[in-house]
Every structure is written in C-alpha cells, then in structure tokens.
Amino acid sequence: MTRVKRGYVARKRRNKILRANRSFRGTHSKLFRIANQQHMKALRYSYRDRACKKRDFRHLWITRINAVVRSYGLNYSRFMHQLRLGNMVLNRKVLSQLASLDPASFNRLIRAT
C-alpha cells in the first residue's frame, strides 16, 4: 500500500477551522486542537439556539401584547379568546408590532373584539 502524505489536505482542513474561529479570543482562535473543540461547541450552540430564538421571540411578543392589553382592562388570554371568537386571525408577531408601532389601530382592534 502506498504512503499518503496529508500535508496539503490536513493544512487545508486546519486552516478552515482556524478561519472560522478568527473572531474567538485567545487560544480558541490560535491552536488547532482547542479551536476545533470550540468550533464544534459553537456549532452545537447555534443549532440549539435556533430553536430557542423562536421561543424567545414568541415570549417577547406575548409580553408586549399583554402589557398593552392590560392598560385596557383585559389580560392576554381573554384578549386572544375574544379575537378567536370574533374570527380575527392575527398572529402574535403582527399583534405585537401593531401594539407598539400603531397604538390607534390596536385601540380600534380592542374595541372591535
């Protein structure tokens, strides 16, 4: 069996990881072995946090809607229930934007429910 010298391929693989870690601090961007571990950990975090991001934004929207709706004497769950009874199909993102950017329209929406 012939000998395979991996100089070019190995260097290319290592440089790819080190380039990805360029913005990391200390040895996480300098030494390959530590940088590789940190790169794998960063990929795990990014995978996990893509799901968390959706959850966090939904939580933010609900909090914003609840804060505005309480000033009208309702709470979030009753408001959403009244929207469903009135066949008004608006998602939480749109309701949150409406509440913060256009309070007059949101006021009309609450009066309509």
Curated annotation (Swiss-Prot):
Stored Pfam families: Ribosomal_L20
Subcellular location as annotated: Plastid, Chloroplast
Entry similarity comment: Belongs to the bacterial ribosomal protein bL20 family.
A GO term, aspect molecular function: structural constituent of ribosome
Keyword RNA-binding: yes
Domain of life: Eukaryota
Main location: plastid
GO biological process: ribosomal large subunit assembly; translation
CDD domains on file: Ribosomal_L20
Name of protein: Large ribosomal subunit protein bL20c
InterPro entries assigned: Ribosomal_bL20, RIBOSOMAL_L20_CS, Ribosomal_protein_bL20_C
Keywords: Chloroplast, Plastid, Ribonucleoprotein, Ribosomal protein, RNA-binding, rRNA-binding
GO cellular component: chloroplast; ribonucleoprotein complex; ribosome
Protein task: Binds directly to 23S ribosomal RNA and is necessary for the in vitro assembly process of the 50S ribosomal subunit. It is not involved in the protein synthesizing functions of that subunit.
The UniProt record lists the keyword Chloroplast: yes
